[in-house]
């Protein structure tokens, strides 16, 4: 009887470990040019596979250069109440990829990595950016049926400050930091030292995208450790 009892305890213990480790970590990478140019297969996937196991991660990248947040947030309007004819096209394609790659899969954590904002800054739509980003997160929570999504925001670099071409540039940086700071599951990543020499808006400086990848991975691991125990 004692032997049976011990075997039962061992069995339950093993089940608990399995249950705790069950599921895969889903990483969603989205945004405009600096996310589109980011070589995730080289600078992101190997690191998260090493951290969690190649069979324990799903990575989906959906990005396109020069796109405003309205291509993701479906209810986007300008401060004047103007609305584009079409919204949410890139969001729809992202969700389609998620559904395809996660069908029948138990998801342990979701981390949304966002690198976007240049287009909205240049267009003068900084004043509605926070509202739009929060709306985008609500879309994700609803469509993924999760309230525990981790968020990483790649803050705009200091490119616009150096060029002095857009007085709204610093305002957007502050908005992005506030969005991260107000959410316990979010953080922002500094990119000021990653500017390229020729096209300084993009991170083509030697090792720029590699360093960006390292920061994404470090931030993601920290958020997952803190929030998805």
Segment roles from a protein language model:
Residues 20-229:
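Cell-envelope and extracellular/periplasmic
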Residues 4-13:
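Sec-dependent N-terminal signal peptides
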